[in-house]
């Protein structure tokens, strides 16, 4: 429970800081940027102290304290600036219709693909079968680790993999949070921020409802029609359809015998690849800022 309070503290610090820095932006933009900034603070600030104190509870608390100081400083320096009272300048149905279903889907996929207990066995998804082992190993091995950290499978070898997307889970583990829940919550949150940020970016860039809807659908509900090959022969053999869900590497995403590789952003990239997901959580705000929006 305390781990989720720590997460909430970083998120609140990010929201307070962005609210002070960008008072003229509407409420939805400030909320999205604030939550994104909060995750960035959670990934980076404890790391600074870990080089001296190891990646333990003290480093996490000092990181949270620094985040609070940063937020309070910005709030104090910009206390007299008027805030934009409007929540959003896009039609409210746009983020509801486009983002909410994707977030619900993502939360469900995070649940089914991350150490789901079934009859005493731990189940994962086909797309996370390999990647999750790496991320779990990094998140658990960073507890009280000296910085720069070693790769747990090769002691004495510095960890060269971008691990900040997993270190936020370590922060929560240090304060007693459940491993599975920490991965699911942070993963779903990052996916939600990517969806929301993309919709905001498209709207600010085009101010077109049709363009925003089309771009979002093409970005996240992508992959083409290759999945239709998986339905070939289903009428004659019902097990062929079941194999899509229960067989090992029988999904439509990988059919080398047909020289076909059908890839979807959500199931093949955002769900299994936490480092990419953490990067996109930062990338979308960076692009938004780059265009001066």
What are the functions of these language-model segments?
Residues 1-90:
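Membrane-embedded, hydrophobic transmembrane alpha-helices
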Residues 1-13, 95-102, 133, 272-288:
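Alpha-helical transmembrane segments at the extracellular/periplasmic loop-to-helix junctions
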Residues 9, 13, 33, 37, ...:
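Hydrophobic faces of alpha-helical transmembrane segments in multi-pass integral membrane proteins
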Residues 19-20, 50-51, 141, 174, ...:
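Transmembrane helix-loop junction
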Residues 20-30, 204-211, 293:
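Membrane-helix interface "capping/anchor" motifs
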Residues 102-282:
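Active-site lumenal/periplasmic loops and adjacent helix-entry segments of GT-C-fold
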């Amino acid at each position: 429970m305390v781990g989720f309070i720590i997460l909430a503290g970083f998120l609140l610090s990010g929201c307070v800081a962005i609210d002070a820095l960008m008072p003229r932006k509407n409420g939805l933009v400030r909320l999205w940027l604030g939550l994104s900034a909060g995750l960035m603070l959670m990934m980076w600030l404890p790391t600074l102290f870990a080089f001296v104190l190891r990646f333990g509870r003290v480093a996490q608390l000092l990181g949270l304290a620094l985040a609070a100081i940063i937020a309070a400083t910005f709030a104090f320096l910009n206390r007299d600036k008027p805030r934009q009272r409007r929540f959003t300048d896009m039609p409210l149905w746009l983020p509801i219709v486009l983002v909410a279903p994707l977030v619900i889907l993502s939360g469900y996929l995070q649940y089914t693909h991350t150490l789901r207990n079934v009859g005493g066995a731990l189940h994962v998804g086909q797309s996370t079968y390999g990647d999750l082992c790496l991320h779990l190993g990094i998140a658990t091995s960073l507890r009280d680790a000296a910085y720069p950290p070693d790769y747990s499978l090769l002691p004495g070898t510095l960890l060269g993999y971008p691990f900040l997307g997993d270190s936020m889970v370590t922060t929560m583990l240090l304060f007693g949070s459940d491993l599975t829940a920490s991965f699911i919550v942070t993963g779903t949150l990052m996916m939600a921020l990517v969806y929301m940020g993309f919709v905001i970016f498209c709207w600010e860039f085009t101010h077109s409802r049709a363009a925003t809807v089309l771009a979002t659908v093409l970005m996240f509900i992508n992959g083409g029609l290759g999945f239709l090959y998986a339905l070939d022969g289903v009428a004659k053999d019902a097990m062929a359809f079941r194999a899509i869900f229960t067989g090992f590497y029988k999904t439509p995403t990988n059919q080398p015998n047909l020289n076909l590789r059908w890839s979807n952003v959500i199931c093949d990239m955002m769900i299994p690849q936490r480092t990419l997901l953490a990067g996109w959580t930062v990338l979308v705000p960076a692009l938004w800022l780059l265009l001066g929006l």
